[in-house]
Regions:
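C-terminal transmembrane module of polytopic alpha-helical membrane proteins
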Residues: 1-21, 178-234
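Short alpha-helical packing/oligomerization segments
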Residues: 68-70, 76-77, 169-193
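Residue-level signature of the transmembrane alpha-helical core
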Residues: 37, 78, 118-122, 144, ...
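Alpha-helical membrane-inserting segments
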Residues: 38-42, 123, 127, 131, ...
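Central hydrophobic cores of alpha-helical transmembrane segments
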Residues: 117-120, 165-174, 214-221
Length: 234
């Protein structure tokens, strides 16, 4: 999954405009990494601890808690993806974001990559609301990262290039999710599945209008599913 894969997969994504030299450098990925690091640093300052930063006021206000979403705090569906619990958590996710994202951003383009990232993040959060404990605190960019895994896999499938390494990475991470305590299976699988659907629209649909429409419909479906589920609990 190194830079060499950019040259082989760039032709897999339909695009109309020729690429400029500036388009070969990732911009969104470094910005996302910087934003995640800044949020982590702020929670650590508030909590006065790198390890126990979940005690920060910002963390409590932004973390995904299905019960809080039911009370109208819908922003948590996205803000939770920029929170991390401890240095190891953010280090692993930011490394994965960089390794996966630097190539995908160049291949998909900045706007489509950011859309894939955010829709995958929303998919992971939706799965937590639908299937996890309603009073559970969930945080992290892992749902979005799993969506990027799906994105890279589908790009390679589209180009008919070997994708066994990506499948192995996905399986390994799912196994880790299952065996390591405290990791949200719902969030990871939700990001993987929803990211796959979003990536399929971006990779296989030829017209930008169709791509945008598919992502909007997917987003609306996720929000409707959450709203219906929460209404049924009331």
């Amino acid at each position: 999954m190194g830079y060499q894969c950019v040259d082989c997969v760039a032709a897999a994504v339909p695009t109309r405009a020729p690429r400029r030299a500036s388009d070969t450098r990732p911009v969104v990925v470094p910005a996302l990494v910087a934003l995640n690091l800044a949020v982590f640093a702020w929670t650590a300052v508030q909590a006065r601890s790198l390890l126990d930063n979940a005690d920060a006021a910002l963390f409590r206000a932004w973390a995904l808690v299905p019960d809080a979403v039911a009370d109208g705090e819908w922003w948590r569906l996205l803000t939770a993806g920029f929170l991390h619990i401890g240095p190891l958590h953010i280090a692993f996710n930011m490394y994965a974001l960089w390794v996966l994202g630097r190539d995908l951003e160049i291949v998909l383009g900045r706007g489509r990559f950011l859309a894939l990232y955010l829709v995958s993040l929303l998919g992971g959060s939706a799965a937590v609301v639908l299937f996890a404990d309603p009073d559970q605190y969930v945080a992290g960019a892992s749902g979005a990262v799993f969506g990027l895994m799906s994105g890279l896999l589908l790009v390679l499938v589209r180009l008919r290039r070997p994708y066994g390494q990506v499948v192995a990475i996905i399986v390994l991470n799912l196994v880790i999710t299952q065996v390591v305590p405290g990791i949200s299976m719902a969030g990871h699988v939700g990001g993987l599945v929803v990211g796959g659907v979003a990536a399929a629209a971006l990779v296989f649909a030829k017209r930008p209008l169709v791509q945008a429409g598919a992502l909007l419909l997917l987003t609306a479906a996720l929000l409707a599913a959450i709203a219906t589920h929460l209404a049924g609990r009331a």
